A protein has these predicted regions:
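Sec-exported extracytoplasmic/periplasmic mature domains
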Residues: 27-31, 38, 63-64, 105-112, ...
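Noncatalytic carbohydrate-binding groove/subsite architecture in carbohydrate-active enzymes
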Residues: 55-58, 91-170
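N-terminal substrate-binding region of glycoside hydrolase catalytic domains
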Residues: 1-53, 57, 67, 73, ...
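Short, well-ordered coil/turn segments that N-cap beta-strands
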Residues: 29-33, 66-70, 111-115, 147-150
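Active-site-proximal beta-strand/loop segments in catalytic clefts of secreted hydrolases
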Residues: 36-40, 74-78, 119-122, 154-158
Length: 170
């Protein structure tokens, strides 16, 4: 599938060859594959909704190869989009729920039997979700989208890297 390249942090793209090699590796070694699909700014329409075109191309290609993805995740750490992409790029939970519905439809078509995981949220000791009062999404996502999900993910960051702008133990 053709993938538009972003800029800066978002300038990389998985090639068809890399994807096929990952699928082959999992097949040969009996590994289960979980893959997070892009739902960041480069995969959004002007109205803010998720554009599933690249995800659909990837899923169709995977199905055509007889490949298998066991778990599809939509996005990663949406609760820090405000920091990474800017305030206007923060995805509302109601929109994310609609995006999950669109992904579930694609999964039914191309990847039946796969599980759907809600985006992994960043979570720090003491702080919880960064600026959680304003941008915390996990509880509301579970309230709105929990019935669509087979798994809800979160990323616990107990180590406090000096590079991390949200460090709580310095």
């Amino acid at each position: 599938p053709s993938v538009p390249h972003g800029t800066g942090l978002m300038s990389s793209a998985l090639t068809r060859r890399q994807w096929e090699r990952a699928l082959g590796f999992c097949e040969r070694n009996g590994c289960r594959l979980m893959f997070a699909l892009n739902c960041g700014p480069s995969a959004r329409r002007p109205d803010g909704s998720w554009n599933p075109a690249n995800a659909e191309a990837l899923m169709a290609h995977t199905a055509s190869l007889g490949g298998r993805v066991d778990i599809w995740e939509l996005g990663n750490e949406l609760n820090v989009f405000f920091f990474v992409h800017g305030l206007r790029r923060q995805v509302e939970v109601s929109q994310y729920t609609r995006d999950l519905v669109a992904l579930r439809r694609l999964m039914e078509r191309y990847s039946p039997g796969a599980l759907l995981a809600g985006q992994g949220s960043a979570f720090w000791p003491v702080l919880g979700e960064p600026l959680g009062y304003f941008f915390g999404t996990t509880r509301e996502m579970l309230r709105q989208a929990g019935g669509l999900l087979d798994a809800a993910l979160w990323h616990y960051y107990p180590q406090q890297s000096r590079r991390c702008p949200f460090g709580s133990r310095r």
